[in-house]
Amino acid sequence: MQTPHSQPESAPQGEQSTHFGFQSVPEADKARKVAEVFHSVASRYDVMNDLMSAGLHRVWKAFTIGRAAVRPGMKVLDIAGGTGDLARAFAKRAGPSGEVWLTDINESMLRVGRDRLTDSGLLVPTAVCDAERLPFPSQYFDRVSVAFGLRNMTHKDRALAEMTRVLKPGGKLLVLEFSRVAKPLAPAYDWYSFNVLPWMGKKVANDEASYRYLAESIRMHPDQETLAGMLRDAGLDRVQYFNLTAGVAALHEGVRLG
């Protein structure tokens, strides 16, 4: 039986392994397993985020949009963009003279986001791509964002290095992610995550396993200070983070200076 503080189960010997929730799996399998989760939840992704955050993800995204300070004419890349919430806001701010891309490794997720942007009257270019191998020129974007996506990436360091590569000097990376909650709230948060959330996933989406993985993936994600160090290692300066709702989520940001 797994607990919120369990160690990952072992992958087969002789293979490079990584974590998939609390499981240790061969690296080659993680992307496939994550894809299966998000194919399953794509049509109810906003419901999933509402369940995981008690609706607060909308407030956190609004804070991220404000910190991005996108201006007319800017070029913006939204990675793992899901249903397009950030891309929609960025496109409105960048205006017709700007350029905003919505990307996701998962075609099902990208289709939902693309359709919603079209329904909003916004023509935003989209691309299915891996954040570890971005198909964009170096020093191209003024802003790069990733919301609730980094924790699902196999090699977070490679992904952060790629995000830094495509930033212009003076450009900013923003990483919004579930994080390490303040200790006094941890017992209640763990109980909610590992009991209530899977139960609601089963009732709302008939998919208990995917929601259990999502809870586990949050616990395996680096804490705030560790992630800040990873941004610095990727080549970013002026790195800082903002705890949101007592650390249930955190917004990290860094600037490429050279």
UniProtKB/Swiss-Prot annotation:
GO biological process, one term: menaquinone biosynthetic process
InterPro entries named in the record: SAM-dependent_MTases_sf, UbiE/COQ5_MeTrFase, UbiE/COQ5_MeTrFase_CS
Molecular functions per Gene Ontology: 2-methoxy-6-polyprenyl-1,4-benzoquinol methyltransferase activity; demethylmenaquinone methyltransferase activity
SUPFAM superfamilies recorded: S-adenosyl-L-methionine-dependent methyltransferases
Keywords noted in UniProt: Menaquinone biosynthesis, Methyltransferase, S-adenosyl-L-methionine, Transferase, Ubiquinone biosynthesis
Pathways involved: Quinol/quinone metabolism; menaquinone biosynthesis; menaquinol from 1,4-dihydroxy-2-naphthoate: step 2/2; Cofactor biosynthesis; ubiquinone biosynthesis
E.C. numbers: 2.1.1.163, 2.1.1.201
Residues annotated for S-adenosyl-L-methionine binding in this entry: 83, 104, 130-131
A Pfam family it matches: Ubie_methyltran
The protein's enzyme class: transferase
Function of the protein: Methyltransferase required for the conversion of demethylmenaquinol (DMKH2) to menaquinol (MKH2) and the conversion of 2-polyprenyl-6-methoxy-1,4-benzoquinol (DDMQH2) to 2-polyprenyl-3-methyl-6-methoxy-1,4-benzoquinol (DMQH2).
Protein family according to the UniProt entry: Belongs to the class I-like SAM-binding methyltransferase superfamily. MenG/UbiE family.
Name recorded for this polypeptide: Ubiquinone/menaquinone biosynthesis C-methyltransferase UbiE
Lineage: Bacteria, Pseudomonadati, Pseudomonadota, Betaproteobacteria, Burkholderiales
